[in-house]
UniProtKB/Swiss-Prot annotation:
The keyword Ribonucleoprotein does not apply. Residues 1-12, 35-48, 312-328 have a biased composition (Polar residues). Residues 253-262 have a biased composition (Pro residues). Transcriptional repressor which coordinates circadian rhythm and metabolic pathways in a heme-dependent manner. Integral component of the complex transcription machinery that governs circadian rhythmicity and forms a critical negative limb of the circadian clock by directly repressing the expression of core clock components BMAL1, CLOCK and CRY1. Also regulates genes involved in metabolic functions, including lipid and bile acid metabolism, adipogenesis, gluconeogenesis and the macrophage inflammatory response. This is Nuclear receptor subfamily 1 group D member 1. The lineage of its organism: Eukaryota, Metazoa, Chordata, Craniata, Vertebrata. Residues 1-129 are annotated as: Modulating. Heme binds at residues 419, 603. It comes from Mus musculus (Mouse). It is found in: Nucleus; Cytoplasm; Cell projection, Dendrite; Cell projection, Dendritic spine.
Length: 615
């Protein structure tokens, strides 16, 4: 995914995650690594033209997506400008090392850099940064066959597919390392590397949006995302008193984020609530971990399947029986708001709306129970950003149940909810592609806010250093959101239902340049939904996805690893308890982690290709 160094006044360094890269000691632009070859939430600082908030992906040790990443060198066009790139005194800002060997990076261009022999006209640059070839790490000349590549690797791949060349078998078990200086040594490994990083005859450029429109759009998104990232990364906690650690018995209210002065709707209330590290609290029991994480997941997250009118029970039952989610009809569908999301959590709806409109004024607490009983309202016209705004359904507690801290229907005001997943907010006529992306990119703050809130309630998360808290959030947000919204994908019909209750076919969305990523999302959703996770299992799995000790740039990886092991033990105990006869279920669930990393890599590359095409 793309990452932006907020400490670099010249615009930062963008890196590709998941491709094979070159050695930092080579003569072409020095390899720079993002602060997480794992997904890095830093991508949020950049434009967001994909389906989920950009968040760089992380490298998992057994990530199958990189099984070919270390493929051996192969032959290249040495007459190409890329192969002739000469030494550079890379003027990069300091970055975390440890990105997986294969990341395609972007190097800051220095005034002392010597351009390739054929001049700089064929070098792909982005705001003074030079993009590197995903195959060999040389200077990329453009976007070729679906990836950024040098002229040498482009020509090599073209000849390979046009002439259907069968290369000699590799003498090193197909384990050669492909870098610029040795890419000619093993043709088989080089061709294998080309395929593994995504080169394809059928690959097309992303977007096809006019250059001027892209530049305008990217400038606006860059400003908004920079602001959001600066707020998230701020080391100044807003709480005046320490936040009590949640216990299994009660979940304390979370202090509200203080509004930041900004005219940008959707980013004025970006979370800054990460707390500084505290003295280690007593290690909770496994039962406490399960109950606290499950409660936080239930009360903080607004489930995608709930918004689509499916209760948690029906959701799991549907998946267990093989039928798609969100198919159970509800009586409210024909009573006045057919396109509004069925939100079972009023306060979650309030958080969504307040994040978009900057309305949060005071502290709020989480509801203790799932509300029920919708009161319907008519839909409103789209707002200035194109979002369909519908009054959120007002819920009252079941008869006979009136918790002291629950909301009473009579005291509840209507809340307008702008759906974060609504890609085409109100119809599609007259909307250009860039307008759709623009509206969509500005609607993800609520979803990201919920990830931050959820992280704060993971037992032990706030005991980590603030740097590690931020690093984990930057690296894992995209993966968490992918888990959350997996139920929106109907694999059988090859459709996606957004929170506006509008269904789009894979063909429709693929026409916008996201075909490969969407196919991978469908595949992941099918695998995850087939496991029919319970609410508690889904919450613990989400926590495991977020707390990953192999993220690069960690200050105290031992503490993160200890927390991760605690969560894994709790997840394993819960899975075995729920279905003791299915001994392989826990293993199947863990195998979804590398799938998430692969998705994060693809998401990052799509985002970067979108930005580069605007240049």
């Amino acid at each position: 995914m793309t990452t932006l160094d907020s400490n670099n006044n010249t615009g930062g360094v963008i890196t590709y995650i998941g491709s094979s890269g070159s050695s930092p000691s080579r003569t072409s632009p020095e390899s720079l690594y993002s602060d997480s070859s794992n997904g890095s939430f830093q991508s949020l600082t950049q434009g967001c033209p994909t389906y989920f908030p950009p968040s760089p992906t992380g490298s998992l040790t057994q990530d199958p997506a990189r099984s070919f990443g270390s493929a051996p060198p192969s032959l290249s066009d040495d007459s190409s400008p890329s192969s002739a790139s000469s030494s550079s005194s890379s003027s990069s800002s300091s970055f975390y090392n440890g990105s997986p060997p294969g990341s395609l990076q972007v190097a800051m261009e220095d005034s002392s850099r010597v351009s390739p022999s054929k001049g700089t006209s064929n070098i792909t640059k982005l705001n003074g940064m030079v993009l590197l070839c995903k195959v060999c790490g040389d200077v990329a000349s453009g976007f070729h066959y679906g990836v950024h590549a040098c002229e040498g690797c482009k020509g090599f791949f073209r000849r390979s597919i046009q002439q259907n060349i069968q290369y000699k078998r590799c003498l090193k078990n197909e384990n050669c390392s492909i870098v610029r200086i040795n890419r000619n040594r093993c043709q088989q490994c080089r061709f294998k590397k080309c395929l593994s990083v995504g080169m394809s005859r059928d690959a097309v450029r992303f977007g096809r949006i006019p250059k001027r429109e892209k530049q305008r759009m990217l400038a606006e998104m860059q400003s908004a995302m920079n602001l959001a990232n600066n707020q998230l990364s701020s080391l100044c906690p807003l709480e005046t008193s320490p936040t009590p650690h949640p216990t299994s018995g009660s979940m304390g209210p979370s202090p509200p984020p203080a509004p930041a002065p900004t005219p940008l709707v959707g980013f004025s209330q970006f979370p800054q609530q990460l707390t500084p590290p505290r003295s280690p609290s007593p290690e909770p029991t496994m039962e406490d971990v399960i109950s606290q994480v499950a409660r936080a997941h239930r009360e903080i997250f607004t489930y995608a399947h709930d918004k689509l009118g499916t209760s948690p029970g029906n959701f799991n039952a549907n998946h267990a029986s093989g039928s798609p989610s969100a198919t159970t009809p509800h009586r409210w569908e024909s009573q006045g708001c057919p396109s509004a999301p069925n939100d079972n959590n009023l306060l979650a709806a309030q958080r969504h709306n307040e994040a978009l409109n900057g309305l949060r004024q005071g502290p709020s607490s989480y509801p203790p129970t799932w509300p029920s009983g919708p009161t319907h309202h008519s839909c409103h016209q789209p707002n200035s950003n194109g979002h369909r705004l519908c009054p959120t359904h007002v819920y009252s507690a079941p008869e006979g149940e009136a918790p002291a801290n629950s909301l009473r229907q009579g005291n509840t005001k209507n809340v307008l909810l702008a759906c974060p997943m609504n890609m085409y907010p109100h119809g599609r006529s007259g909307r250009t592609v860039q307008e759709i992306w623009e509206d969509f990119s500005m609607s993800f703050t609520p979803a990201v806010r919920e990830v931050v809130e959820f992280a704060k309630h993971i037992p032990g998360f706030r005991d980590l250093s603030q740097h590690d808290q931020v690093t984990l959030l930057k690296a894992g947000t995209f993966e968490v959101l992918m888990v959350r919204f997996a139920s929106l994908f109907n694999v059988k019909d090859q459709t996606v239902m957004f929170l506006s209750r509008t269904t789009y076919s894979l063909q429709e969305l693929g026409a916008m340049g996201m075909g490969d990523l969407l196919n991978a999302m469908f595949d992941f959703s099918e695998k995850l939904n087939s496991l029919a996770l319970t609410e508690e299992e889904l919450g613990l799995f989400t926590a495991v996805v977020l707390v990953s000790a192999d993220r690069s740039g960690m200050e105290n990886s031992a503490s993160v690893e200890q927390l991760q092991e605690t969560l894994l033990r709790a997840l394993r105990a819960l899975v075995l308890k729920n279905r003791p006869s299915e001994t392989s279920r826990f293993t199947k669930l863990l195998l979804k982690l590398p799938d998430l990393r692969t998705l994060n890599n693809m998401h990052s590359e799509k985002l970067l290709s979108f930005r580069v095409d605007a240049q």
